[in-house]
């Protein structure tokens, strides 16, 4: 039954569909609990510099980002990192290997959104706990001399984790988003933009042009206060070919992508995603992408 209104009554128009609002722990608190060590900082810095050189043609090694789809378990992540660290050291002359440490999952509809959003995988959504666990994992992996890569989904989470990230991705669902382009323009690490889920390359090229430029957007300070962030632009951005309606890792697709990038006045810098549309979401096909 509806509520009767009188000419003098004022209807409530604020937060009508909000069930609850909880305070988020400030980044500075998490930094005090999990301060960056010299070893972790050196790992991140060295990897960023190596990737910068690769992107600008000063290092002929290949950049490889490898790891699980997303992190869901601390022990499993540490075991994987220990094994990968040995491989990274073994192949360091030819490859710059980063571990894929993804804590957030963009969803087409609904589903588990990642370790930060729901660290216990039980729909309790203990985000403060998830943020702390994410930083702990990044710190410990970097201390194995293994640099980390992740996907950025919002403008707040990076204030808790970005100092431990050597390379970042903007996903196919968010490459066209103005907010994510603005965020990329201020990130301290190199950033890859994926082509659209339908294979559209133009949105990734436009994203790079945008991220190269300065922007102003809303985020939070390390003290947790809402703030206006002004960026300088990020010169270390590139395209990621991830497939779409059809794979786009073949020579013709790569040549077409390079031509479109060059047409926009940008350096033709590409990464190929072995998964997603390029492997038709069948993990056994990933090595076929690699071999091509």
Regions found by a protein language model. Give the residues of each.
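Active-site-facing alpha/beta catalytic cores
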Residues: 2-4, 8-15, 94-249, 253-254, ...
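A contiguous, surface-oriented mixed alpha/beta subdomain in the mid-to-C-terminal portion of proteins
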Residues: 238-244, 256-271
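Conserved, mostly hydrophobic/aromatic
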Residues: 67, 272
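Acidic (Asp/Glu)-rich catalytic clusters
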Residues: 55-58, 85-92, 136-145, 230-231, ...
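Short, contiguous, helix-prone interaction/anchoring segments in small proteins
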Residues: 59-65
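Glycine-rich, N-terminal phosphate-binding loop and its surrounding beta-alpha-beta segment
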Residues: 61, 73-101, 107-111, 115
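N- or domain-start disorder-to-order transition segments that initiate the globular core
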Residues: 14-55
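Glycine-rich anion/phosphate-binding loops
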Residues: 71-91, 124-136, 287-291
């Amino acid at each position: 039954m509806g509520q009767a209104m009188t000419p003098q009554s004022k209807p409530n128009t604020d937060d009508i569909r909000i069930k609850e609002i909880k305070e988020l722990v400030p980044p500075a608190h998490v930094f005090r609990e999990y301060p960056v060590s010299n070893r972790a900082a050196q790992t991140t810095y060295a990897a960023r510099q190596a990737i910068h050189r690769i992107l600008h043609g000063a290092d002929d090694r290949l950049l490889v980002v490898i790891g699980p789809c997303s992190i869901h378990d601390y022990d499993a992540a540490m075991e994987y990192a220990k094994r990968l660290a040995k491989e990274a050291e073994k192949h360091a002359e030819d490859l710059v290997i980063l571990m894929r440490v993804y804590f957030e999952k963009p969803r087409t509809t609904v589903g588990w959104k990642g370790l930060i959003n729901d660290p216990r995988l039980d729909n309790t959504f203990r985000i403060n706990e998830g943020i702390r666990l994410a930083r702990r994992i990044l710190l410990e992996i970097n201390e194995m001399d293994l640099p980390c890569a992740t996907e950025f989904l919002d403008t707040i989470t990076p204030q808790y984790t970005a100092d431990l990230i050597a390379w970042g991705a903007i996903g196919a669902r968010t490459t066209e988003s103005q907010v994510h382009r603005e965020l990329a323009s201020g990130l301290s690490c190199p950033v890859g933009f994926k082509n659209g889920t339908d294979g559209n390359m133009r949105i990734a090229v436009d994203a790079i042009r945008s991220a190269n430029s300065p922007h102003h957007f809303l985020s939070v300070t390390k003290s947790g206060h809402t703030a206006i962030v002004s960026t300088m632009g990020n010169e270390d951005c590139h395209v990621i070919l991830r497939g779409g309606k059809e794979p786009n890792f073949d020579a013709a697709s790569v040549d077409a992508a390079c031509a479109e990038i060059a047409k926009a006045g940008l350096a033709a810098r590409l990464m190929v995603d072995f998964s997603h549309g390029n492997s038709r979401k069948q993990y056994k096909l990933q090595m076929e992408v690699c071999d091509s």
